[in-house]
Structure formats: structure tokens, C-alpha cells
Amino acid sequence: MASVAAAELGYKSFPKSFEPAEKLKDKKILLLSTRMLMNIPFHIYVLRSIENELARLNLSLLRYTLSSDKFFENLKSYIEKSKVDGILCMEFFDEHLIEQVVSLNLPIVFMDTVFSDTAPNFNYDVVMMENLNAVKSYCLTLIDKGNCRSFGFVGYYKNCLSFYERYLGMRDAMFLRNIPYDPRCNILAGNDLPYSNLERLSALIAKAKLPDCFVCANDYIASMTLEALKMLDIPVPERIKVIGFENSPTSKYTTPHLSTINVDKTMLGKELVNALVNKMTRPSKHSKITYIKCYPVPRESTDNI
């Protein structure tokens, strides 16, 4: 409609409209990851959405796992032989590896990206869940309605940009309500465990200053935190509240049921494909980050607040 109206008004330089399907015919999309995604429940739902959207567009889907930059030349060879036209990247949080993949000069979109304290220039598109505002909003609710006066973050907040934004959302809520930040309330260990090891995690919690609420980097870490608190005989939510993130299927079945923040995984998958299709059909020099709206899911671990 816009192009027709422009033509009627005499704007002869307005670009000719086209059907994206014309430019997508016989194109091949590579789903590139550094881990086996089918082992991660959150990614299974996003993958299904990606597969459905690509099928709707009659685009071929290829998969490749790049576990280390040592095998990058193998990846290049595979891309050339397979005649890949665009790349979707998931679980890519290594800055050097990202640079190598971007150097392929193909249309590329990442789901989430690396955290960096040097403010890197993202010369690629990113699609991710809305982290900061979602966590901030939930924390403000717990402050105003749940009488929470201290917060701690559980998870390696530098693991990826999403985790860092969730950490910032907690900090931002505290700042807005004049709640002092105490780093002793956090469990910010690296990724070498301890979040999958109950003994190590419970030992770290025992040494920490217990806040009114733990904000966890994701639902898996939150469920492990609930178990660690049980080992320490610390009641949830009576003594401490716990928040996760993702709204994984298992979050409904923890004891107590886990309060979390829902991510629309179907929309996330669709937007990843949409962003890549736009890069393939409408090349642009400008890179962008697209956020998918998230919302809180109160359950028992925050006293249904």
C-alpha cells in the first residue's frame, strides 16, 4: 500500500515492492549452535517454532554444531558445499567465535549474544527476550506488595547478555526504591558448576548473606536453588522468595511451584526467522536488537505475588 500511494504522489524513486518469497526460493538456512540444543528444554520450543516458520516459507533447514573455533575451517567448508544462504545462531557466547562466524559475510541473526564490559560494536542482528524491564517490574511488585527489602542474584551474570540484563533489572528495581545493594547476598560463581551441584550450591548459599528474595538467572538455576534451600532447612517463601526466568514446563512442578517470567518461545522463534528473512531480502548496513515482551508468572515461591 505504501509503495502504491508513493507512486500516485509522484515519488518515482520509491523502491519497487516485491514478494519476499521471490527472493527466498530454494534458499538454505543453517541453524548453528555451540551445544546440542535438543538437550535444553527451553530451546526445544524455540526450535519447533523456527522449524514451523521455515516450513511455512518453504526454506530448507540445515543444522551444525560448532563446539570450538578449532573446527571453524570445517564449518566454512560445510557452508560452501551446502550453499548456505543465511545463518541463525543459538548459544553463541564466545566473542572470538562470534567474530569468526560474522566474518563469513552471510546474513546472520543471533538469539541472545555475548556479554562484554567493553561495549562491543554488534555488527549483526540479535533477537532476545526482554530481560531488564521484566525482572525490574517483578522485583518492584515484590518490594511494594511483598515487603522484600533485600535481593540477591543467583547465576553467572556475565554468561551472556540476557543474564546480565536480568541482573541489571534486579539492581534497577533496588535503585528505584532506595534499597541498598549488598554483594554478599549474591551467588555469582562462574559456569564451572556449582549450579548443577546441590552440595556446592548449598555451601555457597550458607556462606552468603540471605536476602528476602533470590532472583535466579533462569528456571534451572532457580529449581536447584529451591533444592539447596531445602537442604539448608530454609523455608520458601516464608523466609526467602525465589524467582526464575523462562517459564519452563518443569517450573510448575517444583516444590514449592516456581514463580518465573514467561518467555513466548513461539514468538521468539518466529522473530528469529523474520529477522533473518529481512536481512536476506532487504540488506541493510544497520544492525539491531529486537526484544520479545515477557511477563511475570507468580506462583508459590513468591507467595503467589
Language-model region placement:
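N-terminal helix-turn-helix/winged-helix DNA-binding helices
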Residues: 1-39
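Alpha-helical recognition/docking segments in bacterial nutrient-uptake
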Residues: 23-140, 205-206
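Short, solvent-exposed amphipathic alpha-helices that sit
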Residues: 41-56, 134-137, 161-181, 224, ...
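Short beta-strand elements in bilobed, periplasmic/extracellular small-molecule ligand-binding domains
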Residues: 54-66, 153, 171-197
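An alpha-beta-alpha
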Residues: 136-178, 288-302
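Short acidic capping loops at alpha-helix termini that bridge into adjacent secondary structure
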Residues: 149-150, 181-185, 236-241
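Flexible loop/turn connectors
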Residues: 198-305
